[in-house]
Every structure is written in structure tokens, then in C-alpha cells.
Regions:
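Conserved "landmark" site that anchors the functional core of diverse proteins
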Residues: 1-323
Length: 323
């Protein structure tokens, strides 16, 4: 069986849960920007949660199916159609051979996830099928999908059409979106007033936000404590001697526009990081559209761990409901 890509939409790529273990070599973890949505889509069609599916940004692709299949659409909300007939999202849908899957205009969120029973079965690169175009890894010969591609699908597992996920289990962006963060090693570089101003300000997602990082604009420039820059750090107070970046780190080049480093981000560099977004909110960031208002909220490590546990418990509930 294969998926025939008639129209790839704006930007559609093959993604799974990523390729951890190579960050020390400068290869990003990659994978779905909204891992929760990717996991749930796979659960609905009977796949392993790490199976590969499609991630579409802002606009869905147009696809025909060479055989009968079970599919699920999760993530952003938008009209989903099979041969022009609207279907439910977050639901296991039966597709018959020759039918065409298409999408309407985005209503909320930013990224759409498409899982098919059996999972997309393209070659594995460093333990993952996830597309990383800069490194030409995964995907279709290292690139996003294009019109005319025939994406192979693996052997289908067991699942029932009609299974669905309740709206209460779906987290969509609020206004403003609240991004919880833990202050980092370089927070002390800010003046006390500037650190508080950063948290008080309302920022907006910049149009440049992508898989490498989400940039934000609109807040006041940061002010730094006067100090002598260490040798090799450069003259700008936002510079450091090169250090490692964790997933979710918040760097602020020049002290003006925060960037949250996401799935395809670099593993290190010479900008200070004032903290990191908690893991429970990283999927949420992947669903923020440009110009969405955002506020950063500082939380403790215990609060961050509690939020992560809450997300894990939610996934356990969904697994149990679909078992």
C-alpha cells in the first residue's frame, strides 16, 4: 500500500518521535513538533506510538490511497474531507481504495498530524524516519514530501474505526498563550527589573517561527548586569563562551527577541539562555500560529515535573480508553 501525494500543501514532512542520541554530534532530536498529537494519531489507528506519519504546517496535503486504510487526523483543527465529505478529527476513519483526503482552511493550531494504519515505511536514518532537510536525513531522500511522491505504508495493526479522543483531552492555544519556563544558568546575567519585565511583557510569535526555533517579538529589550565579558565571549552582553543548548532553551540574541529552540535546533552556540520551556509545554508551542500573543511564566522544577507527570497520566488514560 502507498499514499499518493497529489498536493503537499504548504510544508508537509514525514515525522515520528525523533532520533535522540546524536545531539552531542550536532544532529538535532527532530521528530514531531507536537508529539502528543502524533502519539494519539498513531494510537487511534493501532500503530506503535513511534510510527512515522505526516506533519503538515498551516495547510493540509491532498492524498489518494492505493488500498483501504484506517487513518486519523490530530493536532490543529480544520475541516477534513474524504471525497469532499467532511469527517471528524481525532477519530479513526476508514478510507477506501482510491479515495482522496483533503483539508479546508485552518481554524486553530498550526500543525496537522496524519497517521495511517501500518505507518509510513520510508527508510530509517539514524534510528528515525523523521525529516531533517538541513542534514538530508529521513523523509523522502532527506526532503519534505512533494507532489507525485508515493509513500510506502507498513503492515496494519489492529484498530477499530470510529474510536475517538474527547475534546477535553486536546490542548489548543489560549489567548494569550502561557508558556511555563524554568529559569536557567544565565538568568543572573539580567538585572532584577529586566528579568521581571521579561515575564510581565506580552510577546507575539514571529512569522519566522519554525522547526528550528520559535521567535517572539514585542517585549522590551533585556538589560544586563554590568560585568566584564569573559575571554572568547565577544563584546555583546548576550554572548557567552560557547555552551550547550538543551531542547526548549530560550536564547535572546542581542537581548531583543527570545527564541525557543525546538526539534530541529542546533545543539550549542554562543548566546546566553535565560531558561527553558518546560517539557509539558513544548508540544503546545508547536501549535502556535504567527502573531499569537504569548506570556512567559516562571515555575519551579517541582512544578515542571508535576506538569510532565500530568501529561504522562493523560497519555495513560488515552491508552487505556483505546485498549
Amino acid at each position: 500500500m502507498a499514499l499518493n501525494i497529489l498536493n503537499p500543501g504548504l510544508s508537509t514532512s514525514i515525522q515520528d518521535l525523533g532520533r535522540p542520541g546524536y545531539f552531542h554530534l550536532g544532529i538535532p532530536i527532530g521528530g514531531a513538533m507536537d508529539r502528543f498529537a502524533m502519539r494519539v494519531a498513531n494510537m487511534l489507528v493501532g500503530n506503535a506510538e513511534e510510527a512515522a506519519g505526516l506533519e503538515a504546517v498551516f495547510m493540509g496535503p491532498e492524498i489518494t490511497f492505493t488500498e483501504d486504510a484506517l487513518i486519523a487526523i490530530t493536532g490543529a483543527e480544520l475541516p477534513v474531507m474524504l471525497d469532499g465529505v467532511e469527517q471528524n478529527t481525532w477519530t479513526a476513519l476508514t478510507v477506501t481504495k482510491g479515495q482522496t483526503l483533503s483539508f479546508g482552511f485552518l481554524q486553530s493550531g498550526a500543525r496537522i498530524y496524519i497517521a495511517v494504519s501500518g505507518g509510513i515505511d520510508t527508510p530509517v536514518a539514524l534510528g528515525s524516519r523523521s525529516t531533517y532537510p538541513i542534514g538530508a536525513l529521513g523523509g523522502v531522500d532527506g526532503r519534505n514530501v512533494a507532489a507525485g511522491d508515493m509513500l510506502p505504508v507498513g503492515k496494519a495493526g489492529k484498530a477499530m474505526a470510529g474510536a475517538s479522543i474527547a475534546p477535553a483531552h486536546r490542548r489548543m492555544p489560549s489567548n494569550p498563550a502561557i508558556l511555563r519556563m524554568v529559569k536557567g544558568l544565565y538568568w543572573h546575567r539580567l538585572t532584577e527589573a529586566s528579568g521581571q519585565q521579561f515575564l510581565n511583557d506580552e510577546w507575539k510569535v514571529a512569522p519566522e517561527a519554525d522547526r528550528m526555533g520559535y521567535r517572539f517579538r514585542g517585549g522590551k529589550p533585556l538589560e544586563f548586569v554590568d560585568r566584564e565579558q569573559p575571554f572568547g565571549a565577544g563584546s555583546d552582553p548576550s554572548n557567552i563562551v560557547d555552551g550547550c543548548y538543551s531542547y526548549g532553551s530560550i536564547q535572546v540574541p542581542g537581548g531583543t527577541e527570545p527564541i525557543v529552540l525546538h526539534r530541529d535546533a542546533v545543539s550549542g552556540g554562543g548566546y546566553f539562555t535565560l531558561g527553558a520551556i518546560i517539557s509539558a509545554d513544548m508540544d503546545y508551542i508547536g501549535q502556535l500560529q504567527p502573531h499569537t500573543p504569548v506570556k512567559f511564566e516562571a515555575v519551579s522544577m517541582d512544578e515542571a515535573l508535576a506538569a510532565r507527570k500530568e501529561r504522562h497520566n493523560l497519555l495513560d488514560q488515552i491508552r487505556a480508553s483505546l485498549a
